[in-house]
Every structure is written in C-alpha cells, then in structure tokens.
C-alpha cells in the first residue's frame, strides 16, 4: 500500500555523488532524524553531507503516519531487561529531546507544516503486557 506522502508529495530526484568531496561530517540516511542532524550541524558551522540510498524522506520517514513521537509501542520493559534502567532512561530522554528539537526548529524557522501536539496511545490486546509496560515506563 502506497503512503499518502508518496501519492501527494513530489520529492525531487537528486543526482548521485560522482566525485570525492570533503565534509566535516557524513550522515547516513536522509530521513527525519538524518535531516535534523544535518540542520543542527549546519547551525554550528559544520559542513555535513547527507548520504541517502534512495530519495530524501523516501524510506522509513515516507512510510510513517506523519508523527514525531517519543513513544514507540511496548518497548520499555524489554529495553530495561536487555540494556538496564540507566540506558533505557537515556534512550527515553533522548527521544523526548528530539521531539522538543523538532518543535523548536518548526517554531524558529517558521515552517508551515500544520504541526499539532496530541496525546500518544499504546494499544495491546494483552492486558498483562500493557501493565508490565506501564510499570516499566513509570520506573523511568
């Protein structure tokens, strides 16, 4: 199934890199995260190059529901078990900081994108897993 973004947005095709170039940083991937990093590096005066296999915004970003979120389903419990509470907390904080950074850039650059803050929900058919996830999230 083709996403609405594929149907309604004409992403300009870029020519492939054909020669060696110099840069302060190379970013692999031209999705939302890669472009945000490139923007941040430019803001501090660094020359960054974004390398994207297909088209900018054409991979995972294209297939989203146009959301920027720090909530990624049932992940806290498993993350804590695999990586520990401290690493899980840093991950959750970094995700929320990214959401705040997108909001800041949209506001400061006056980007017209109909950005809205809304509630986030996680659905599960397994009530026990949902409770365990809520407990794990509260630990963080």
Question: What role is predicted for each listed range?
Answer:
Residues 82-140:
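Rossmann-like flavin
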Residues 59, 63-94:
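Glycine-rich active-site loop/strand segments that organize a redox cofactor
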Residues 1-25, 43:
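Extreme N-terminal leader/targeting segments of oxidoreductases
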Residues 20-50:
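N-terminal Rossmann-like FAD-binding beta1-loop-alpha1 element of flavoenzymes
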Residues 35, 57-58:
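Catalytic P-loop NTPase motifs of RecA-like helicase/translocase cores
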Residues 41, 63-66, 136:
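Short, glycine/charged-enriched secondary-structure capping and boundary segments
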């Amino acid at each position: 199934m083709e996403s609405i973004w594929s149907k309604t947005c004409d992403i300009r095709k870029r020519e492939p890199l054909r020669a060696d170039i110099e840069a302060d940083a190379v970013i692999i991937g031209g999705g939302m995260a890669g472009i945000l990093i490139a923007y941040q590096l430019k803001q501090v005066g660094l020359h960054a190059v974004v390398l994207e296999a297909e088209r900018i915004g054409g991979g995972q970003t294209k297939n989203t529901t146009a959301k920027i979120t720090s909530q990624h389903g049932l992940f806290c419990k498993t993350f804590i078990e695999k990586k520990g509470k401290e690493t899980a907390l840093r991950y959750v904080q970094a995700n929320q900081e990214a959401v705040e950074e997108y909001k800041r850039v949209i506001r400061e650059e006056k980007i017209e994108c109909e950005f809205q803050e809304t509630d986030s929900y996680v659905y599960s058919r397994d009530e026990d897993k949902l409770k365990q996830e809520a407990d794990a999230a509260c630990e963080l």
